[in-house]
């Protein structure tokens, strides 16, 4: 059985839940010698503690700091791209390789079908995303979700294939950044990401980008140019991680909380700044507490966005996408 990961700010809740489990176990193990009044009292105590646990849970997750949301975005049990693909789509056909160098396992992609049974909506899509591992072995295989140049070139190849067959593109972003190794730099990481930005802006099919966990720097935006930019409630998206920002500004990682506040990297921050278009609500406690519900919510929103984008003609899609990204940010011009 996997060990439950408890974040620092979750410890008071974890302790109360452990106490509640003990009381429930005590009730299950109670013998017939226990009087009805004692059983009733224990039931009452359990109900009281359940209310306290629920209130504490809602209080904690309603008032998360930016750094705490970064921690939730990195939770090892959080659903990854493959989890969402399996929960949201059917008939997934993975496609491999960049046709230049190799197949980067940190980015996966392929054709799939997303459906809505209530309305009969059924749409083939190209779905592409970063993929992390669940343990040391799989993380080494996936390079901890840090894509190399061939990963971004593979992603672009799949997007252009989708364009050829007139299928919309969905990207799922979850990376601590592009791989910073010397070999990756020699193979052209910067060029690969820049080429993706240029080509994604011109794709003549709908493109929806979703930050499902970490969205760090060029590694994230390398598959992040779209008609709609969505963010999971407890994800983050920034030019730099809080730890790296702290090490640059204060020469130490211990100021990561202050860095997270200064970076304004949460979904709420970015929605208010016009960087993203929509926040995807998560179950209380984070996406990992109920992946099925999280995937169902994301699927519903994706279908809604697809229905809005599919009727648009290619020229309109490209024009609006370029205008969208051109209008981001604030700057001053000299008179």
From Swiss-Prot:
Lineage: Bacteria, Pseudomonadati, Chlorobiota, Chlorobiia, Chlorobiales
Keyword Transferase: yes
Annotated Gene Ontology cellular component terms: acetyl-CoA carboxylase complex
Pfam families: ACCA
Annotated ranges, domain CoA carboxyltransferase C-terminal: 48-308
Compartments it resides in: Cytoplasm
Family from the record: Belongs to the AccA family.
Class of this enzyme: transferase
GO molecular function, one term: carboxyl- or carbamoyltransferase activity
NCBIfam families: accA (TIGR00513), AccA_sub (NF041504), PRK05724.1 (NF004344)
Catalytic reactions of this protein: N(6)-carboxybiotinyl-L-lysyl-[protein] + acetyl-CoA = N(6)-biotinyl-L-lysyl-[protein] + malonyl-CoA
Keywords assigned: ATP-binding, Cytoplasm, Fatty acid biosynthesis, Fatty acid metabolism, Lipid biosynthesis, Lipid metabolism, Nucleotide-binding, Transferase
Gene Ontology biological process terms in this record: fatty acid biosynthetic process; malonyl-CoA biosynthetic process
Job of this protein: Component of the acetyl coenzyme A carboxylase (ACC) complex. First, biotin carboxylase catalyzes the carboxylation of biotin on its carrier protein (BCCP) and then the CO(2) group is transferred by the carboxyltransferase to acetyl-CoA to form malonyl-CoA.
EC number annotated for this UniProt entry: 2.1.3.15
Protein name: Acetyl-coenzyme A carboxylase carboxyl transferase subunit alpha
Main location group: cytoplasm
Record's keyword annotation contains Acyltransferase: no
């Amino acid at each position: 059985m996997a060990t439950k990961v408890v974040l620092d700010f979750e410890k008071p809740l974890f302790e109360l839940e452990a106490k509640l489990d003990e009381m429930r176990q005590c009730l299950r193990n109670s013998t017939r010698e226990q009087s009805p009044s004692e059983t009733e009292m224990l039931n009452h105590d359990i109900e009281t503690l359940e209310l306290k646990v629920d209130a504490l849970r809602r209080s904690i997750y309603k008032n998360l700091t930016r750094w705490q949301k970064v921690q939730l975005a990195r939770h090892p049990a959080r659903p990854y791209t493959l989890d969402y693909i399996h929960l949201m789509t059917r008939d997934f056909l993975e496609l491999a390789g960049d046709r230049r160098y190799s197949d980067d396992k940190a980015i996966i992609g392929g054709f799939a079908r997303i459906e809505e049974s209530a309305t009969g909506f059924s749409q083939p899509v190209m779905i592409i995303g970063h993929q992390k591992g669940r343990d040391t072995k799989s993380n080494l295989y996936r390079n901890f979700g840090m894509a190399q140049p061939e990963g971004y070139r593979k992603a672009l190849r799949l997007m252009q294939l989708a364009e050829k067959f007139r299928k919309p593109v969905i990207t799922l972003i979850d990376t601590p950044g592009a791989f910073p190794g010397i070999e990756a730099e020699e193979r052209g990481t910067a060029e690969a990401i820049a080429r993706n930005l240029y080509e994604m802006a011109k794709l003549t099919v709908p493109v929806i980008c979703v930050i499902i966990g970490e969205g760090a720097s060029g590694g994230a935006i390398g598959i992040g140019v779209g008609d709609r930019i969505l963010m999971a409630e407890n994800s983050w998206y920034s030019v730099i991680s809080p730890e790296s920002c702290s090490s640059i500004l204060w020469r130490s990682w211990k100021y990561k909380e202050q860095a997270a506040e200064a970076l304004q990297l949460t979904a709420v921050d970015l929605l208010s700044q016009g960087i993203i278009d929509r926040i995807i609500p998560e179950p209380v406690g984070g996406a990992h507490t109920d992946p099925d519900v999280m995937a169902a919510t994301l699927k519903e929103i994706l279908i809604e966005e697809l229905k809005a984008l599919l009727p648009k003609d290619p020229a309109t899609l490209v024009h609006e996408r370029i205008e969208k990204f051109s209008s981001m940010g604030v700057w001053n011009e000299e008179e």
